[in-house]
Amino acid sequence: MKILNALIIGTAAAALLAAADARAEWPEKPIQFIIPFGAGGGADIEGRLIAKAMSAILGQPVVPINKPGGGGAITYTFVKNSKPDGYTVAWNSTSILTTTNIGNVPFEYTALDHIGQVAQQPVPFVVRKDARWNTLKEFMDECKAKPNTLKVAFAGFGSATHVAGVAMTQLSGCKAIMLPVKGPDRRKMILSGETDAAVDIFFVPLKFVKAGKMKFLAISSGKRDPATPDVPTAKELGLDMEFDLFRGLSVAKGTPQAIKDKLESAMIKAANSKAFAGRMKKLKLTLAPMGQAAFKAKLAKANANIVAIMKNAGIYRSKMKK
């Protein structure tokens, strides 16, 4: 019996040592970097940049894979159900909070482990430069006077742009036609007049603003952005809403802490690298890297804020029992 117990203990110890060695050697193969939105949009552009920077640091390819759909639901479900070994990573955004609270998935944001944040940006309400509205109030006043006539494009149901758009319109008493449209097509539709406005990723339409083809009527964040200092926030205009669109990393629940720590370190080093930071500056994005602990606190606060916004706007649909 003593010999048998010794064998069992020895086998268990060997297994634990093997697991520890595996974590110490991680990564030993390419990492899937899952992007929740389609090619060519803001999430895709930013995601591919950070994936490339992380590849150099980790010594293994970090391979971008687009899995769009459901305002991030497809990606978050895929990563949630993946093996918790750090080889499948979600390029998260504020959509991890919006898509869970709008009911696109049957779980909460806490169903995944979150590595940290890379950057953040406001969400602008965009119209064509020669549009007849020069303020958000002018747009919303016409929308209230002519319900279900003005069109507003956004990324997808449950996305941050969807929630921002619905919040801005509903809190203004406006009934708009909301159009889920892929990133590049949103800009085309604004310029062609197929949509009257769009709620978009900040840096992509910003270049059209600089080129004199579009204008921002408002942004969603709590304070004005240095890149567009004359554009007011929604809160300044009397709307009870305030949030930024952030980007970061998430993995399957139960991923070993040692692996999460390595991912966090690589993410922060990549975010602060000269190449990535320089690119973010050119794109007019706010580089704001933070690790697991700080990001956990931010997510909790942001989630409470978004739930309040969604309830106020009448679009809270979480499938989780409270």
Predicted region positions:
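Bacterial N-terminal signal peptides that target proteins for export
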Residues: 1-9
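Cleavable N-terminal signal peptides
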Residues: 10-12, 22
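N-terminal signal peptide c-region/cleavage motif recognized by signal peptidases
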Residues: 17-21
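N-terminal (or domain-start) structured segment
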Residues: 23-111, 148-149, 161, 170-201, ...
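An extracytoplasmic/periplasmic, membrane-proximal ligand-sensing/linker region
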Residues: 28-30, 171, 257-322
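Short coil/turn segments
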Residues: 40, 94, 128-133, 154-159, ...
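Hinge/capping helix and adjacent helix->loop/strand transition within the periplasmic-binding protein
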Residues: 54, 78-87, 100-185, 244-279
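Periplasmic-binding protein-like
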Residues: 118-124, 218-253
